[in-house]
Amino acid sequence: MRRLLLSALTLLGLSLLSSVHSQSLSIENVHVDIANRDTVASTVPITFDVTWSGSWREGESWDAAWLFAKFEREPGVWADLRLVPSSGSVSGTVPATLELSVLPAGYANGIVLHRAEEGRGEVQFTARASWTYGASYYDLPRDGVPIRVLGVEIARVAGGPFEVGEAIVDSLRQPNAFRSAGGGAYTVASEEEIRVSDGPSALYYDVPEGEAYAGGDQAGPVPGSFPKGTEPFYIMKYPVTQGQYADFLSLLPARARAARDITAYATYADEGGTITCDEHGCTAHNPDRAAHFLSWADGIGWASWAGLRPMSELEYEKAAAGTPAERSRYADGDLPDRVGTSERRSIWGVVDLRGGLWERVVTVGSPQGRAFRGTPGLGFVDDLGHPYAFSNLDWPGPRAVGSGYRGGTEGLLGLSEVTDRTYGAYEATYGNAGQGFRAVIDEP
């Protein structure tokens, strides 16, 4: 069975070479206002322009940009840029809201920028914030320092209860799918602890004998601290792209870059990989193509560096299927005409949550997964490109214990239904052509 599983996870990447998404986020005119720096508070204003097309806001659903920055602390060494929490402002072509994501240490490591009113179409904004360089124990030179502002498009998943699994006869239920004791869908009503058992008012899932390594241990409870999706959160519209991953590699020290380099896989270029690296950095020749061959360690390294976090498998079902009133079995209401030929959007505007690259999630099916508390990435990694050991102790570590797979593809094995948990607790350390990564962040 394990051999078949490994083959399936590898072969599912073969139909994904056309997974290219039209991402339009542009960040330009980055300016550090050295003339107005505050040498007492060790802060300095920064401004930059942000543009993207296809923006929307309707009711409780809208898209946004997650923006974060790095500065060149010394030649070739880039560090996370920290912001004063109360310093943000924005102007633009439409009314906008700028929210800073504040970490427990008291500084912000990124910005969520979105429309303030309903509407659709391209948006252009000028964002302003104050860089607290003193928080990095850094003395800003009089002539300034190079900085990079980076970003990803994200979509808001509204708060509220939702269902996991589906009301269906056992013979048609997806493998290892969540259910209630009576066999119907289970309602996740709040962030409170969830009891796991085949009894009343509990969450359960059936796993064939001997396959707990893939489907989960059927144990619990799921703690109140485990992110469940009933509170609002933002999720990346698209998986990490090759352009975004190339930026990550380029701004890492040499040892960390080598550890997180995905281009050494023998079939990388043949399977659609376009990232190349040299002593000056890395370049993606097709930057909008989804980054594949990402292992769990690669994904959490990128998420930590970007100030984001992995998603739980409950958050995956909320983002993919929606609320009970708008629930979709396939995350877009129907199957596409042909695999890889059209973007599938969930009701929240999230693209290809099923039928594309496998989504890596934190599982409820192991003690290590259930220990996840959803702490945010701090914006930096260690010398192997991993989240620092002291910073995200709740995350499944580089060995992937506590992780799993959701989403799949109908291209080979028909594993694309949102409720399918065939590999919901499978802890794979490797990367291959069928694996990408998508991160989330709690609403500020």
What do the PLM-derived regions correspond to, one by one?
Residues S7-L16:
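Bacterial N-terminal signal peptides
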Residues S42-I46:
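Structural beta-strand segments of beta-rich domains
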Residues R289-A290, R344-R345, R373-P444:
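Disulfide-stabilized, aromatic/cysteine-rich ligand-recognition loop
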Residues E58-L67:
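Short coil-to-beta strand junction motifs in C2/discoidin
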Residues P85-V152:
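Extended acidic/polar, glycine-enriched regions
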Residues D49-G59:
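Short amphipathic, basic-aromatic surface patches that mediate peripheral association
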Residues A284-P398:
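Functional-site microenvironments in short loops/helix caps that host divalent-cation chemistry
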Residues S91-E118, G165-D332, G365-S366, D442:
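Active-site microenvironments of metalloenzymes and redox enzymes
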